[in-house]
């Protein structure tokens, strides 16, 4: 025969399980966002728009949110304020982001903001669009006009890649290897990676 102690312990476990599944259901059915991270020119915005249309989600480009808030282009913010100030602005924008059923394309430097990344991981599934350095170099024509954050004077793209790749891997819930994939193949791969 079960004692009151065993019954209350069982109820407490059951209660925790119900809470867990309630949160899980909320995250998967109400707030399931897809957060795209990766190097500049990895296709976050381009693939993100098409993915959003394909699965019926909204689309948010956090770089555009920054530009709208600051009333300047990214490259102008970086040039006038410096890389560290830009990273602070970017972290504040991404850390305050609220979305439901959206694809969110982030800036390549979003991974420098630990608080923002924790928040984004709570908002949805973080997908790293992984490209080889050679492919990034091929795609990225004008690094200055793109508003790419270089934290050190004279930093090369190879150094930037080496610095960021481990951060993308650290925060990713899923990784899509994009080398050799066309736009539609990339979109299908992202959808598969998040179970859509």
Could you say what each language-model-derived stretch is?
Residues 26-29, 50, 54, 163-196:
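NTP-dependent small-molecule kinase module
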Residues 122-166:
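A glycine- and Lys/Arg-enriched "phosphate-lid" helix/loop adjacent to the NTP-binding pocket
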Residues 61-110, 114-121, 146, 167:
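ATP-dependent small-molecule kinase phosphotransfer cores
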Residues 53-62:
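Post-Walker A helix-loop "phosphate-sensing" segment adjacent to the P-loop in P-loop NTPases
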Residues 39:
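P-loop (Walker A) phosphate-binding loop of NTP-binding proteins
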Residues 36:
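Hydrophobic anchor at the beta1->P-loop junction of P-loop NTPases
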Residues 3-5, 26-27:
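Short, positively charged and aromatic/hydrophobic N-terminal segments
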Residues 45:
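Walker A/P-loop
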